[in-house]
Amino acid sequence: ETIADSFASFLYKNGFTRIFSPKIVLAGAEGGANIFQIKYFDRIAYLAQSPQFYKQYGVGIFGRVYDIGPVFRAEKHNTSRHINEYISLDFEMGFIDSYEDIMKTEIAYLKYMIEQLKERNTFELELLETRLPIIGETIPAIKLSEAHQIYFENTKKDFRNEPDLSPEEEKYLTIWS
């Protein structure tokens, strides 16, 4: 609850407008993603796998938008890092200079969220013996090509021409970082 509440309050205070995207849609929002098909009265519909389409429309109207809600991914996974349904905290900003504007917003939100968790969830944090991270002014980031290269140099397995990280690379880079 605190995470979703802090997300909403932080973005609202920073000029974002909340949108409520539909969860039953006539087509997928992301090309290539597997989506859950359902019968919707006399036609076929799908469970939304992303609010992306609606966020982009919202940016054209409001400039900055966010959405909190369930998303559904009909992708077969065999990892503990993926699930088929989760609550997505999504935001979209228009008229930015670079991806760094988005990263600055994310860092500021993470700091705010951690403050809120410390204030509102002391009991739970102590019960779970959880220590929250300290967020600095920047978060280390590397380019995809650099991630592939680091993995290749250390394992000799070559994914350098792939458009995304493999599950092996994700695991390795988590430990590496």
Predicted segments with their positions:
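Hydrophobic face of alpha-helices
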Residues: A4, A8, M103-L110
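Context-gated lysine
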Residues: K13, K23, K39, K55, ...
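Metal-assisted phosphate- and nucleotidyl-transfer catalytic regions
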Residues: E30-A33, A108-S177
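Low-complexity, flexible helical/coil segments
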Residues: Y54-Y57, N84, D101-E106, F123-T130
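Extended, domain-scale alpha-helical bundle/helix-rich regions
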Residues: G94-I102, I107, H148-I150
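Class II aminoacyl-tRNA synthetase-like tRNA-binding/catalytic domains
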Residues: E1-I96
